[in-house]
């Protein structure tokens, strides 16, 4: 593990590169770069959203907002005052600088490879950031007393994806949360992908219940990935009521639009007419991710790809080539409208790594056919 402290004059703009950019650049017909599980919201959810379009002349309802809080709370068996609907997890990350300042923390810690948006937000706010670059298989290392940045008395903000994007690693964060509590530090767990996993893994690894009852843990969740809602921005935070109140005061009025609230209500509210459909959809996605991932890895392995074993609706795989050749092939695929998430913008990785979204077998087979053809036609060297 390597620790790297902020360099004041370094350009960190690469941290804002996300999979949607790769998809747009390729004008993708086969999109393997964006981690949204479905390429469209389910029909029942589209119908619910469409029903409310005629009512957009009205401001978002506070009653609906409260109902969404109560529905999400019931979904997790926590109190509604521990929930805050968000315009996607990205909005939650936008709160980090203020949380850091208010809590009197001294440094932020970001393990990598990991989702880069939190680091970009913190660095833009000129908050000291210590990155921890993990080596394959990218298992998390907790702070150690002899490390300067984690010595007793140093109050930290840790931000970790669980499962982590792009590695797919699922961490046991409970011991880390306990250790950080002893240091009077804060843990933010980004669980944007966790509801694509089997329920038993969610129960074992989610910090939702800890977040609702302690003041040093915040969880961000997303409906984007499982329900195909990236364009609508639907998520929520779970935290102690005091922290939820603090986050609420950071937001402008009417920060959640009507259609966002309607979608969240349809998905999570146990009294919603679509609740059972949402549950069935979620369970089907969980089964599909396992089966479709196995198909994808099975197709890549004979071609020499080495895939990290992870728990997510995407895989991180090392290509059989060096960075230059791997990027050339990725660009060849992009020219044929197949998008692959480049990984050299993830600290700790280079262009020899690809992140691939898990798709249905037909889509995977179409990708493999084009990839195989590109390899047969290419004159490459490592």
How would you label these PLM feature ranges?
Residues 99-123, 128, 132-135:
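Conserved PLP-anchoring active-site segment centered on the Schiff-base-forming lysine
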């Amino acid at each position: 593990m390597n620790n790297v402290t902020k360099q004041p004059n370094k350009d960190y703009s690469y941290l804002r590169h996300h999979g949607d950019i790769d998809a747009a650049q390729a004008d993708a017909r086969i999109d393997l770069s964006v981690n949204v599980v479905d390429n469209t919201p389910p029909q029942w959810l589209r119908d619910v959203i469409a029903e409310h379009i005629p009512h957009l002349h009205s401001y978002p309802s506070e009653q609906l907002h409260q109902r969404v809080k109560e529905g999400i709370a019931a979904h997790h068996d926590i109190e509604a005052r521990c929930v805050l609907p968000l315009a996607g997890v990205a909005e939650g990350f936008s709160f980090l600088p203020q949380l850091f300042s208010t809590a009197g923390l001294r440094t932020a810690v970001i393990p990598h490879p990991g989702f880069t948006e939190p680091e970009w937000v913190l660095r833009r706010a000129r908050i000291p950031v210590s990155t921890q670059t993990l080596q394959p298989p990218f298992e998390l290392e907790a702070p150690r007393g002899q490390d300067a940045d984690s010595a007793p008395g140093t109050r930290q903000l840790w931000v970790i994806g669980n499962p982590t994007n792009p590695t797919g690693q699922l961490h046991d964060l409970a011991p880390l949360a306990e250790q950080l509590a002893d240091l009077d530090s804060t843990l933010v767990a980004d669980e944007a992908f966790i509801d694509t996993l089997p329920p038993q893994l969610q129960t074992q690894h989610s910090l939702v219940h800890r977040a609702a009852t302690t003041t040093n843990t915040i969880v961000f969740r997303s409906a984007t990935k499982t329900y195909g809602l990236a364009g609508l921005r639907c998520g929520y935070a779970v935290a102690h009521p005091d922290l939820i109140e603090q986050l609420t005061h950071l937001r402008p009025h009417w920060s959640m639009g009507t259609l966002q609230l309607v979608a969240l209500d349809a998905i999570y509210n146990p009294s919603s007419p679509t609740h059972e459909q949402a549950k069935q959809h979620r369970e089907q996605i969980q089964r599909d991710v396992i089966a479709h991932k196995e198909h994808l890895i099975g197709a890549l392995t004979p071609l020499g790809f080495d895939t990290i074993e992870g728990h997510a609706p995407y895989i991180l795989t090392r290509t059989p080539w060096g960075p230059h050749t791997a990027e050339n092939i990725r660009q060849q695929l992009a020219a044929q409208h197949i998008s692959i998430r480049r990984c050299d913008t993830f600290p700790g990785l280079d262009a020899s790594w690809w992140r691939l979204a898990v798709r249905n077998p037909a889509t995977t087979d179409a990708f493999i056919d084009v990839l195989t053809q590109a390899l047969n036609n290419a004159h490459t060297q490592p």
